[in-house]
A protein has these predicted regions:
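Hydrophobic beta-strand positions that form the internal "hydrophobic ladder"
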Residues: 57-60, 108-109, 153-156, 223, ...
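Beta-strand-rich domains and repeat architectures in extracellular enzymes and scaffolds
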Residues: 40-70
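Beta-propeller fold detector
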Residues: 83-87, 135-138, 202-205, 252-257, ...
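Short loop/turn segments that connect beta-strands within beta-propeller blades
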Residues: 76-80, 127-131, 195-199, 245-249, ...
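Residue-level detector of Asp-centered blade-edge/turn motifs that repeat once per structural unit
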Residues: 55-56, 103-104, 151-152, 218-219, ...
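A flexible loop/linker signature enriched in serine peptidases of the S9 family
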Residues: 64-73, 89-95, 111-124, 139-145, ...
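Serine-hydrolase catalytic core recognition
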Residues: 372-682
Length: 682
């Protein structure tokens, strides 16, 4: 479950509490002036959502979000001569997003609603020349993403949901249930193509397959893609790898079915299929993944003509998240390494990929926005570009020669922003035979002679990792440091960054081994720093929300909790969510075949142990971690007289999109900890 996966059905049983919670949003409690200033500061960041370097390495394009509207800017590769992509309307008055340079670097394809109704995105191209001519390439009636040109530049392909009513993502607000569930109203994402001269989209992939991602073959004749039957939100965890002729109506063939293969890939997930430059094989990432888009695992390869997949990187102690072929025998790999972003070269033969040179390791989040930790490369693989941020530096575009290591920023979009929180450091400890890592933020204006409270923030997933990044106004733990807290963000077993065995170490053990890793980390910090053990707090979203509900049933160490989009009862959750396929790889069986393994990790079964004041927050259309789970936990706490509050946000999914709600949920969390875990030094 991302920062959690999809649902809605039984919300009707909570209509009255939901109405009350919704009304409460209209009259929030007074804002502490410090909180108001902090929220204002967080709201000033301009997010860089995508970066693309032209194939000839001469130009950059990026998507920057200002005032909740994405817009495109184009510059030379060194960041100079930056200017908005010119269209009708003032910059920021309409949407411009998604980027794809033509192979000859002469044109940039993108999506925009600037030429039509707000929200109705069509495909456009812009010439890079002096006139910057923009023309509409295709009219769309639905949701599109992942623009990609064929190698010959004759065809633009993209993922397309014709007639879509929502963004194609499990974290988006769920479509209200109506009609025959699982049969009526299904929205199928397919590969669509448009000629370079323009025209109506043509569907290339079958109507009975939901496509999650794809790539062109080097000769522009075929697609490789990851797909599954509908509903798409639920079935990514059982998706297969296909190859298909690029012409419409061609029949796909299965290259890899994780449900049938033998060996380490059996029953796991696959992502990021990429053709080798000579077209003879496909590489991909395979591993235990809790969320589409949160990619991590081992590198695999399979012959393009068919055959058994081979694990190229068994036993490595990092987690590859993205890669690109740089020759038939070399890969450039972005990976999570001990809580940091790392870019490395791998040498590849028929059966193994071996790490060679490390280009850089950064305590920062990096990526071009097209996939997790992706790099945008020039055609000769000598130049790269991406967006980067950390706890110390707000997002900027970074670009430069690959051979020179980590490139410098070439923009100053957020140069005026400075952190109001304390310094960050990586913390490491050993527990239960494993090495564990996490990140610690010191309180702002830290004084070693004083004692401070500490908030433990558990990441979502669980297959994910905390890597330093600049916070926005949405829910997150960094702002607590500004108000005088230590903030501890662990990467316990189940996280990315220390190899696939570490990721799989919390199978059938949610809330037990991983919680013990976290508590051991708290102990290690308390031995070195002036943390007040009587003022420990706990928070998290998605899987972190589950942990925030479960941990207080196992320990009394935490004195205040904020649980975001959590899971209180894995048994009832199994029948409520819309993404139950993710659970069997983790629990080993369905709840109907092994209810005990689900009960073992359910907070509701140990609810009598909870004494901790808990704020519970959730979106009413969260399909990944549905609202009934939050109601169930809140109701149980109320019945026992434990101080608690439940806030439900209308029309929100797993990831909140309304800026007012993003601000409100963080404000409430800051005030909750301020009430039950005051940050004054002692």
């Amino acid at each position: 479950m991302r920062t959690c996966p999809r649902l809605l059905p039984l919300l009707t049983l909570a209509l009255v509490p939901l109405a009350l919670a919704t009304q409460a949003l209209a009259a929030p409690s007074p804002v502490d002036p410090r909180i108001g200033r902090l929220l204002d500061q967080l709201g000033k960041v301009q997010a860089i959502e995508q970066v693309q370097l032209s194939p000839d390495g001469q130009h950059l394009a990026w998507v920057v979000r200002r005032h909740d509207k994405p817009s495109i800017e184009i510059a030379r590769a060194d960041g100079s001569d930056a200017h908005p992509l010119a269209m009708a309307g003032a910059p920021g008055s309409c949407r411009q997003e998604e980027l794809a340079w033509t192979p000859d670097s002469h044109r940039l394809a993108f999506l925009s609603d600037c030429g039509g109704k707000p929200g109705d995105l069509d495909v456009y191209t812009s010439d890079v020349g002096a006139d910057g001519k923009v023309r509409r390439l295709a009219d769309l009636d639905g949701y599109a993403q992942a623009l990609s040109w064929s190698a010959d530049g004759r065809t633009l392909a993209f993922l397309y949901v014709e007639g879509a009513t929502r963004r194609a993502s499990a974290v988006a607000a769920a479509k209200p249930a109506a009609g025959e569930v699982g049969v009526e109203g299904l929205e199928i994402q397919r590969i669509a193509t448009v000629p370079a001269a323009g025209g109506a989209p043509s569907m290339a992939s079958p109507a009975d397959r939901y496509v999650y991602e794809f790539s062109w073959s080097p000769d522009a004749r075929c697609f490789a893609y990851v797909a599954a039957p509908a509903p798409g939100d639920n079935n990514w965890w059982v998706a297969k790898l296909y190859a298909q002729d690029a012409r419409a109506g061609a029949a796909p063939r299965v290259l890899v079915d994780p449900g049938r293969v033998q060996g380490p890939l059996h029953g796991l997930q696959i992502a990021l299929p990429r053709w080798s430059p000579d077209g003879t094989r496909l590489a991909f990432i395979g591993g235990l993944m809790s969320d589409q888009g949160s990619t991590g695992g081992d590198l695999y390869a399979v012959p393009a003509a068919g055959g058994a997949p081979v694990n190229l990187t068994p036993g490595i102690h990092a987690t590859p998240a993205w890669f690109a072929w740089t020759s038939p025998r070399t890969l450039l790999v972005s990976q999570v390494s001990n809580g940091q972003s790392q870019l490395a070269d791998y040498a590849v033969d028929a059966t193994h990929a071996t790490q060679q040179r490390v280009h850089f390791t950064l305590p920062a989040s990096v990526g071009d926005g097209s996939a997790s930790m992706a790099m945008s490369l020039s055609a000769d693989h000598r130049q790269l570009a991406f967006a980067q941020s950390s706890y110390a530096a707000a997002p900027e575009v970074h670009a430069g020669p690959l051979e020179r290591g980590a490139p410098a920023a070439v923009t100053a979009i957020n140069a005026s922003l400075k952190p109001s929180w304390g310094k960050a450091e990586s913390v490491e400890w050993d527990h239960d035979g494993r090495h564990v890592q996490g990140w610690l933020l010191y309180p702002a204006n830290y004084d070693p002679a004083q004692r401070y409270p500490m908030i433990v923030s558990v990441h979502g997933g669980p297959a994910a990792a905390v890597i330093p990044r600049w916070p926005g106004v949405g829910y997150g733990s960094v702002p607590f440091s500004t108000l005088g807290y230590f903030v501890f963000m662990p990467n316990p077993r189940g996280s990315f960054g220390q190899g696939e065995a570490y990721v799989q170490a919390n199978r059938k053990d949610f809330g037990h081994g991983d919680l013990s890793d976290i508590l051991a980390g708290v102990d290690a910090i308390e031995k070195k720093l002036p943390v007040d053990d009587q003022r420990l707090g706990l928070t998290g979203w998605s899987y972190g929300g589950f942990m925030s509900m479960f941990a207080p049933t196992q320990t009394q160490r935490f004195h205040a909790v904020v649980a975001g989009a959590g899971i209180a009862n894995w048994q009832s959750y199994y029948g409520e969510n819309l993404i139950d396929q993710w659970m069997i790889p983790y629990f080993g069986a369905s709840v109907y075949d092994d209810p005990a393994v689900y009960a073992r990790s359910s907070a509701i079964g140990f609810i009598k142990q909870v004494k901790t004041p808990t704020l519970v927050v959730v979106g009413d259309r969260d399909a990944e971690c549905p609202a009934p789970q939050s109601f169930e936990f809140w109701h149980a706490l109320r019945a026992q007289g434990v101080p608690t509050s439940l806030v439900v946000y209308p029309n929100e999914g797993h990831h909140f999109v309304d800026p007012a709600h993003q601000r409100d949920v963080l404000q409430r969390a800051l005030e909750w900890f301020g009430k039950y875990l005051p940050a004054g030094s002692r």
